[in-house]
Curated annotation (Swiss-Prot):
Full protein name: Envelope glycoprotein gp160
GO cellular component terms listed in the entry, alphabetical order: host cell endosome membrane; host cell plasma membrane; membrane; viral envelope; virion membrane
SUPFAM superfamilies in alphabetical order: gp120 core, Virus ectodomain
Stretch list, region V3: 299-331
This protein's UniProt keywords: AIDS, Apoptosis, Clathrin-mediated endocytosis of virus by host, Cleavage on pair of basic residues, Coiled coil, Disulfide bond, Fusion of virus membrane with host endosomal membrane, Fusion of virus membrane with host membrane, Glycoprotein, Host cell membrane, Host endosome, Host membrane, Host-virus interaction, Inhibition of host innate immune response by virus, Inhibition of host tetherin by virus, Lipoprotein, Membrane, Palmitate, Signal, Transmembrane, Transmembrane helix, Viral attachment to host cell, Viral envelope protein, Viral immunoevasion, Viral penetration into host cytoplasm, Virion, Virus endocytosis by host, Virus entry into host cell
Spans annotated as Immunosuppression: 569-585
Coiled-coil positions: 614-646
Cited function: The surface protein gp120 (SU) attaches the virus to the host lymphoid cell by binding to the primary receptor CD4. This interaction induces a structural rearrangement creating a high affinity binding site for a chemokine coreceptor like CXCR4 and/or CCR5. This peculiar 2 stage receptor-interaction strategy allows gp120 to maintain the highly conserved coreceptor-binding site in a cryptic conformation, protected from neutralizing antibodies. Since CD4 also displays a binding site for the disulfide-isomerase P4HB/PDI, a P4HB/PDI-CD4-CXCR4-gp120 complex may form.
Signal peptide region: 1-24
Region annotation (MPER) ranges: 651-672
Gene: env
Lineage: Viruses, Riboviria, Pararnavirae, Artverviricota, Revtraviricetes
Organism the protein comes from: Human immunodeficiency virus type 2 subtype A (isolate ST)
InterPro entries with a match to the protein in the record: Gp120_core_sf, GP41-like, HIV1_Gp120
Extracellular-side positions: 25-673
Amino acid sequence: MCGRNQLFVASLLASACLIYCVQYVTVFYGVPVWRNASIPLFCATKNRDTWGTIQCLPDNDDYQEIALNVTEAFDAWNNTVTEQAVEDVWSLFETSIKPCVKLTPLCVAMRCNSTTAKNTTSTPTTTTTANTTIGENSSCIRTDNCTGLGEEEMVDCQFNMTGLERDKKKLYNETWYSKDVVCESNDTKKEKTCYMNHCNTSVITESCDKHYWDTMRFRYCAPPGFALLRCNDTNYSGFEPNCSKVVAATCTRMMETQTSTWFGFNGTRAENRTYIYWHGRDNRTIISLNKFYNLTVHCKRPGNKTVVPITLMSGLVFHSQPINRRPRQAWCWFKGEWKEAMKEVKLTLAKHPRYKGTNDTEKIRFIAPGERSDPEVAYMWTNCRGEFLYCNMTWFLNWVENRTNQTQHNYVPCHIKQIINTWHKVGKNVYLPPREGQLTCNSTVTSIIANIDGGENQTNITFSAEVAELYRLELGDYKLIEVTPIGFAPTPVKRYSSAPVRNKRGVFVLGFLGFLTTAGAAMGAASLTLSAQSRTLLAGIVQQQQQLLDVVKRQQEMLRLTVWGTKNLQARVTAIEKYLKDQAQLNSWGCAFRQVCHTTVPWVNDTLTPDWNNMTWQEWEQRIRNLEANISESLEQAQIQQEKNMYELQKLNSWDVFGNWFDLTSWIKYIQYGVYIVVGIIVLRIVIYVVQMLSRLRKGYRPVFSSPPAYFQQIHIHKDREQPAREETEEDVGNSVGDNWWPWPIRYIHFLIRQLIRLLNRLYNICRDLLSRSFQTLQLISQSLRRALTAVRDWLRFNTAYLQYGGEWIQEAFRAFARATGETLTNAWRGFWGTLGQIGRGILAVPRRIRQGAEIALL
């Protein structure tokens, strides 16, 4: 007995648990959740250059950052922000040197001679070991005659080409930098046969010569509905799976459009320390130099160069430079405490957690790439106001490494090339027309691009030509995210219908970024502010759109809807598309415009539940990301089923309206239903009768069908009615009493006719009874309505009379009250005036009484 009671209690508890312990999917809108994104960013700049402002929007300095209490993964190399920076800077670079004319006609044999000075003697390059360090006050800086510097090597060439007259050839003279032509090595004559460089490897185009590549600063901004996260950890080295110091921002810091190899110039990441960004899977690094050492480079192209256009043929104008004398060689000198900075780089490298080589800084050295590499790799390649310099860094490396047996200078000679290899696309070469006048440019050195080849005995820091690494240092601590404010979580509450609740308005904090301030809070705490967060999200999106629209309007004259302009305008509608997409998704689940939406879908995994007090929404989202597709599909199916149920319920609701019963369309349906019922009854009766007849025929109560159809019994045998038959015979053949002399087919037809007439009579009686009863019911209803209307009329008359009598009584009471009030006020007023009169007369009688008293006293 006790065991039965325990089993009963256990079953009750299990049933209660099944009813009350079921978890249902609950949809939350406005949760601080995000995922990595890769949409196009738009840029903003303060530069007012024509081509720069076409590419970017004006910068208004209205940007903000907030700290988040979350942990996030960052990777400078697998990063859409840095990849977009590389592509966009290349777009700016390509715009500035936009090619207009193909120089294929110049790929002809030229007869070239080395140029010699007409008025001066060339200064030979010294080959002896020397140590020369120059400063700002050195005289050779002004005269461009520092030790080891010579004159630029140039060649004067002649070639024949059909000009404007196609049937005649014309002789042209052209001067080239020696690095831009390739001459036949087996030609021992003074006059050599040369070709323009790269003629046999790629198509060469000449720049439009509209403007030159000058650096500019700009920043990236996320479209509305998206945000940028930045790793603010001091020890961040380009790859950090668990960055704990994360801030959210709408835009990046300012960055420089750098295009150089070996070194990064004018970067914005320099700090009072040296740090290294190291690729997560190979030896590529970017080293940020300590700005304490004030490292700068000053480059100069001496001479007063002029440029002349040469018309080669119709539509082809080639910009060249005439030779008056051999120009002085371009050169760069390095200012600052370079040796100390390089020592700090070695010490920082030895302490880096990714470094596996020797810790002896004496065995860590800087080396140049192989001489057989591309010129942009073997030399330091940089731009100086439109001219691209290729600087031989041997003297500089000897000076930094203090190689006593080799030439050491803190300046380097540079060659100028006008046919350059583009740094982003392989096999594309552009001819840059020379710039006139003397060119100088000064830059701050902020980083080193290098590959680390470590070993137990020696470590080589090899300078690199990966220009893209510069932007990984500038923007590698950012990542682009898309805010996904829709979250799922299990709760024991099932969907129910209730009146909408008006929540109190929350204060908008920091616009769109204020929505992310609760990212580090627990799920339970964040869920309490979903209404305010969702409004903050939408308000922030609208605010970002308005700001973007304002800057687009300010620049619409210069924008002209270029490719970048189209992207900037597209960024403005991205947020609205995202918001509408979220609302459409919520609507498909039956949760449109709700912050917390309970559903009837059971939770998919009972063992997977959130810790509302200790887990953030971002952590919970990562755990259930694989289940979102199934949850979404289940919610859609549940909503479809609920809509079907609501449709059926609404159809039933129409019956409770009395007027719908008398609708014409309803009566047509009723008639259809009645016809269907009558036809069904007839068919059912026929089927039942046929079945009964078949059963009787099988029992022998009708003649056997095997008799010939044309057979008629000629002799009628009368059987005595009182003669008893044998019991077996009566049971087998049945009772044959009566005048059954008709043939059985005719009798059977008569029987069917009688049954049909009986069925029709019964249907007629049923319909007549139904109509009579309906008429009686309608009469009763009409009588009830008549009595009800009479009662209502009498009640209204009685209450109207009662109200009329009450109104008259109230009016009379008011009139009596008015009369009493008037009389009371009149009497009070009279008494008040009488009292005032007595007081006045008493006051006036005081002198008289005093006089009378004085007279009496004198008498």
